[in-house]
Amino acid sequence: MSLKVLIVDDDKMIKLVHKMMVVKSGLSTEPLVFDEGKSAYDFLEAQHTDFDNYLILLDINMPIMNGWDFLDAIQGKEFVNKLQVVMVTSSVDAGDRNKANEYPQILDFLEKPLKVDACNYIKSLPTVASLL
């Protein structure tokens, strides 16, 4: 099986750091990077005929389509079972952490920026490990 990694964040520096950490940790050699949820959603919609498994490192606060809107948009889609999501955010709002429990695709809720040890932790999650 294969797992593709999507990094979805509007902060240019965070995207660069997360991409470096994902590659350095061996989580993915070529993560795909998106500026906000809408572009990631459109990409996934276009993949529906040849769908891989995706790990999405998703920020909450972004323009156009934020992380919660992205998660709402994928619910009920035929490809939703091929998606695993780790929320990677600067939010310290307990309400955001609680809201994350409402989405079965969310594996965890981590603070950014990601470091190699966080990527190694993500790799160790059973759902992710089974796809690597």
Which residue ranges define each predicted feature?
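Receiver (REC) domain active-site loop signature in two-component systems and cognate sites
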Residues: 62
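Alpha4 helix (beta4-alpha4-beta5 surface) of REC/receiver domains from two-component response regulators
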Residues: 69, 82, 92-108, 116, ...
